[in-house]
Structure formats: C-alpha cells, structure tokens
Amino acid sequence: MIAEISNSQRTGYTASKIFHMQRNEIELFNNTYQFMLVHNYVNYFLTGGVFAMEEGDASGTGLWDPVKKKWSESLTSIISKDLLSKLPPVSSSIESIGNISKELVKEYGFNSACRIDAGSGDNMYGAIGTGNIDPGILTISLGTSGTAYTIVETPFVDPTGEIACFCDSTGRYLPLLCVSNMAGGYNSFLEKNGLSHSEFEALMTYTHPGNDGNVIVPWYEGERTPDLPNASPIYFGFSYDDLTKEKVARGLIEGHVLNLYEGFSKMPIEPKEIYLTGGLSQSKVWCQMIADIFNCKATPVLGEGAALGAALHAGWIWNNENGSNETLSKIVKPFITFNEQLRCTPKDENIKVYDNLKSLYSSITMRIRGLGGKDPFELKQGLKG
C-alpha cells in the first residue's frame, strides 16, 4: 500500500467510504457522476460547474499518491473499473480554479472578478493560520483528537505508515500525525469528578513530573496511531495507594502528551518551536507539559487557525495571480497572534525526568503490541520519588 500511494490505508479516508458504497449501495455508486469532498462541491457551486480537487485533500483520499501526484489505477480498479472516471482532476494548491459564476454575480451581487481558491484541508490551512509556513516549526492541534504537522520541502514517506505523507497548500509537503485520543479522556475525567479546567490544574500541584512512574496509556476508544482499533486504556504501575484523584489526573495528561510524542518521534523534524492550537492549547498545564516532554518552546496561537489560514491563503493566491510578488510569510505574519502569557519553555529539572518517562511509555506500548522492548517494571524503578 505504501509503495502504491506513499501512505497506509485508513478507515477514515475516502477510499474506504467509496468501497463501502460500491459493495453495499451499488445503485447509488453507479449513478454517481463525480465523487467530491464537501468543499470541492462548494467550489463546484461557486464556479458554476468546475470539478476540481487540490493536492492537499487528494492526499487524504487513500487513492492518490502525493509523491507521484496521480490517482492510483491499481487501487481504484480494485474498488471498481469505473471509479477512476468518477474522480475529479487534481489541481495545484497554489492556483485558483476559476471565477465566481455569472448566476451568483447576478443573484447576490458578487464582484464578477472574484476568483475561487482551490481550497484545502483543515490541517493544511491550520499550518498557515498558526504561522507554520517555514521548515522547523511544528503545529500541534489539541482537540478531541490530536494532530502534529510540519512543513518540509520534499515528501517524507514513513515506512510504517503511521505518519501521513500529505501535500500542503503551498506547493510543499505536510507530514502529519493524528492520534484519536486527546481531549476525550481528559473531558471524561473532568465530568466524572465534577472538575473545572482550573480545578484540574490545581490538582497537578499535588504531584510531581513523572508521577513516580505511574503511567496511563490513554487508548480510551481504540487508537488511530498506533493502529489499534480494539485497544483500551492501560493503567501501569499504580498501587492501590496511588489511585488518588491527583495521581490519576497527572497520569492522564502525561499519558496523552506521551502518546502524541511517541508518534511524533517518527517525524522528520527537530522543531525549533511548537505552535499550539485547539481548545486545550489555552491551558498553562498542557502548554508546559508539551514544552517539557517535547523539550521545545511551546506557544499557543489565538483565534481559529484553519479559518484564518483559508482567508490568508486566498489573499496570497489573489496577489500572485494579479502580479504581486509578496511572499506568503509577509502576508501571514501580521495576522498571527500568540498568547504570550502562556508561552512555555522546557524546565531543565523536568527534561531528564520526562526522557526517562518517554522510555518507560514506549516500553509499555511495545510490550503490549508484541514488539519486545525494554522491561517497563525495571524502568519504573528509576522514576520512583
């Protein structure tokens, strides 16, 4: 699969949905003229009939190779010999796809010179909207799921398939990690214990980094990365006396960040700075935890990164197509606002502790997956307070 499309196949990709339709709703499949993502259809409507998908979103269909930049005839033919003819052309992400339709100009008064941007995915635009437009920056989105992505000049193909090889929306590439467990376990803990975010943060003051080697592997609803759909959470090292609200709280947040870090460790980057977005990014505890575990300065970005990125991308494309040589960086920089009060740098006293905890976490997950690894019980001894 990786040799064919430079990615593994995921159930959330478009390929699996079309495959399901072809097997279970054959009449609907046969009557489909063109498959599009939602924003491709919006563009189709705005332009009055342009069928187009751009490279960023095509990367996530599970049918298009972002390295060869073409639809996979082998994969499409496995689903149906007719599928390739039902897929739209893939346009460049740095060009518009056409003008707004005459009908919409007449009905709503749009400027007839209005061009329609090709559009892209939320993570591609999230990179722009958080100021992540040059190599060396890592954006982490802390929502129901967690994502981490960066910009690189050449494609990165992960032989394990855990890091997605995507095109970005600037003509470059966006290696992307997605874990399915992030805010879900945290929010459930708050709800079960009747805690506010500030009360949760207060609990953290009663414990110390490393949690004496008591680790929670937060696979609450299976896990996407690593690909373990039937997984459940693991509470490692907790004695009966350790099962306090305070220690479980620390184990939970450390586990979520460690789960993200373990996937990130396969990415082709040593970040010089991390930009944070998503609901949990405005928490001092989460920011500091990420700074310490990733051993890198971490700063939350204010606003809706993906929405801002879409607007800035459209402005950049408009400028380019109207003779301006203004760089994307120059356009983006004035609009990015950081929450300086929550800017966190790694604490020297925590870095060594978390280096040991990262090794312990990795040994636990490797043993569970049958991949060998070091003895987690032995590693835990070095983390006892």
Q: Where do the model's predicted regions map?
A:
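Active-site core segments that coordinate phosphate-bearing ligands/cofactors
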Residues: 1-5, 12-52, 62-81, 96-98, ...
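A conserved helix-loop-beta module that forms one wall/lid of the active-site cleft
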Residues: 80-92
